[in-house]
Amino acid sequence: MRCYNPIDGNSIPKPFRVHPGTEVTQDLVNKFIQKHQINKRRYNYLMDMYDNRTDVFNLPDKEKYKPDNRLSIGYARYITDTFVGYFNGIPIHKQHEEETVNELIQLFDDDNDIEDEESELARLACIYGHSFEIMYQDDDSKTHVCYVDPTECFIVYDTTKEMNPVFAVHYVEDDEMKVFGTVYTETEMIDINGNVGGVTFGERETNIYDGIPVIEFILNDSRTGIFESVVSLINAMNKATSEKANDVDYFADAYLAITGMEVTEEDARKIRDNRIINAYGPDGAKIEIKFLDKPDSDATQEHLLDRLHKMIFQISMVADISDENFGATSGVALEHKYQAMNNLAHAFDRKFQSALRQRYKLLFSLTVNMPQHSADAYQQIEYTFKRNMPIDYLAQAQAATTTANLTSTETALKILDIVQDVPAELKRIEEEREKSAKSFDREGGFFNDSELKDEDHANATQSKCASDTKSGE
């Protein structure tokens, strides 16, 4: 059986913390690597749940003569992927009021395939409760980021209310249990190597960023995975489903009882092979032949399975979009079905945005990316999170039309999911207005094609006459 007990609340690790001003030494790093190794038991368990390697496969074997089905339903993956698709199925939009800043953001995002990067960060955060991103420079001095799961990385914070990061460690173990990695501090990056029992510091280089280039993306303050609260329910569901399958096998292997006569092995063989019973007892004895009935607990089992299924989605707060009644729902009723998951997504929005601000702060801190006087431009970046769900465009259009009479056009356009970039849309609207204005005549009417041609012909004639007059002179 596994070491991690998901039901035990004490098994959920707390963030690593040290007093402010603590010196980062080899001993300190080794101490926290040892603590992190303990946390990896939980991480491995959660990834096993996501990959559908659940506890039902670790239950004791039954006797050989009993059916022993092991069925596991992929609830953890379904819950995670459904929520990530809802939260980040539509990529996060970033917008700044200055076009030069927008161009830098777009270039950085394109170079790093940021849509996939952020999707993986969200997925890992939903599985483990948090994930990490490391920023680095390539050989051409271009800034890059890569996601890292928490089995290979951790951050140590100070004990202040602000929880400022003191140092971060990224390390990997090879097949020979040797450890290689890097320690990141405010001022330097230190290579480490050794083994889990102890690592030593190697080469050092200056940290060129304005802060530790390791960013933590958290799902919630407790850093619990999105399906972690229903682990016990998932295990119970798998066990109940497996027992249900065992019962089906039991009924398929029902016993045939023959009373009132003696049945030899040869008789039993003929009954089995010929599927015919011609029985008579001595001296007119009463013979009874029937299958033994087993207790039927089907209704009880189905009630348990139905209850567990509903509780898994209710407690995880993720909508069961595979429900038959879900597809027939629309409008306000559909929004109510998404309400719990929407609340969860909004809470994740705030955590995710905080990490994104830290990412672009580090990006803008390098003069190779942004002039020093504009290093604070990251503070004005506007992040737009949109939910990936069925859209009623007619209702949105009506709401936007009504809102436009009360607010600015920009505010009204934000209601429309079909508009991905509001400032760009406003620019296109203005261009169309200018183009339309040019097609009006001085009295406010439109030129028709013949009028435009006549006007062009008249202008050409006047030009020719003026030219001829000048030549005659």
Language model segments and positions:
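Short, charged/polar micro-motifs that form catalytic or ligand-binding hotspots
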Residues: 123, 227, 291-302, 338, ...
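Amphipathic alpha-helix face/heptad-repeat signature
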Residues: 121-125, 233, 240, 301-304, ...
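Structured loops at beta-to-helix junctions and adjacent beta-edge loops in soluble globular domains
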Residues: 136, 170-172, 240, 292-295, ...
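Charged, alpha-helix-enriched surfaces in structured cytosolic catalytic cores
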Residues: 113-116, 303, 307, 407
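Extended, helix-rich architectural segments
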Residues: 1-144, 465-473
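Extended, regular secondary-structure scaffolds
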Residues: 119, 126-127, 132-223
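C-terminal helix-loop subdomains that flank or include functional centers
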Residues: 277-283, 307-473
